[in-house]
Structures are given as structure tokens and as C-alpha cells.
From Swiss-Prot:
Keyword Metal-binding found: yes
Binding-site list for substrate: 75-78, 97
Cofactor comment text: Divalent metal cation.
UniProt name for this protein: Putative 4-hydroxy-4-methyl-2-oxoglutarate aldolase
Organism annotation: Chromobacterium violaceum (strain ATCC 12472 / DSM 30191 / JCM 1249 / CCUG 213 / NBRC 12614 / NCIMB 9131 / NCTC 9757 / MK)
Keywords from the named record: Lyase, Metal-binding
Length: 159
């Protein structure tokens, strides 16, 4: 079966959540999927760096950045770290920077917008907890599928 979000919605509509269509694609891979890891933070990407420094094992990092459009939570250096450590992608309720460089990486990246300002570094935030992002409840260990048509979440691997 295809892992296109449209096909997954058709086949598994009762089992999935569709995130509100608020994200733009910034990574070199428009299509990505994997089990979810979560972070909740605000204008501080210290935990993003910490998490991406760990083995990704094909996971997708979902970052609840509070929807801030005042600074970026991911740039080219953290994108390269994600690739090096085997992350499939990121979905960020916030901004990214170095968007041209991110677009060349073999990584899925969805975010609200690009912003040139870097975040603060105060080691604040939480990891591995339930989130509410783009109208959906998201839990660590659920599965995320993203492509040109949107982002969906399921309690189990689909397809």
C-alpha cells in the first residue's frame, strides 16, 4: 500500500488524526514517516539539539514550540545533526532558519515559517510527553506520516 497521506486517509480514516494544514515543507524530503518523539518548549531549542544528538532510529520529532514566530527552533546545523543520527524528520509548531540549506538535506522538515533569528539557549522545556499540535493530540510512540498533502498521526504503523 502507498504511504501517501491521501491513500492512508482513505484506507484508515477512523484510525487517524489529520493535523490542521498550517505547515510548510522545508526539508529535502517532502515525504517522511516514523514513530514519534515529542518536545514541548518555547523559543529555546536546547532540547532540540539534545534530542537530535541521540540516535533517531527513523523517528520523527514533533516539537510543540507554542506556535512562536519570533525565532527559529531548527537550522542547518541541527538539520545535519538529525541526518547524521538517523532521524526521519521533524514537525515543528514554530519556525526554522537556513531554509535553503535545510532543503538540500535528506530530511523531512515541516514548520510554520522561516525566521532568521536564532532561539535562546536556557535548557528549558520538556520531552516525551503528550502534545496538542495543529488541532491534534499527539503521543510519543504514535506514528506520523507527512507528504505534500499534509500530516497525519496514527496509533500504529499503517500501510
Amino acid at each position: 500500500m502507498s504511504l501517501a497521506t491521501t491513500d492512508l486517509c482513505d484506507a484508515f480514516d477512523a484510525e487517524i488524526q489529520v493535523l490542521d494544514p498550517v505547515f510548510q515543507s522545508f526539508g529535502g524530503h517532502a515525504r517522511f514517516h516514523g514513530p514519534i518523539a515529542t518536545l514541548k518548549l518555547f523559543e529555546d531549542n536546547s532540547l532540540v539539539r539534545q534530542m537530535l544528538g541521540e540516535p533517531g532510529n527513523g523517528r520523527v520529532l514533533v516539537v510543540d514550540g507554542g506556535g512562536s514566530r519570533r525565532c527559529a527552533l531548527l537550522g542547518d546545523q541541527l538539520g545535519e545533526l538529525a541526518v547524521k543520527n538517523g532521524w526521519a524528520g521533524l514537525v515543528i509548531d514554530g519556525c526554522v532558519r537556513d531554509s535553503a540549506a535545510l532543503g538540500k538535506l535528506p530530511l523531512g522538515v515541516k514548520a510554520l515559517a522561516a525566521h532568521p533569528r536564532k532561539s535562546v539557549k536556557r535548557d528549558s522545556g520538556q520531552r516525551d510527553l503528550p502534545l496538542r499540535v495543529a488541532g491534534c493530540d499527539i503521543l510519543p510512540g504514535q506514528w506520523l506520516y507527512a507528504d505534500e498533502d499534509g500530516v497525519i498521526v496514527s496509533g500504529r504503523p499503517l500501510g
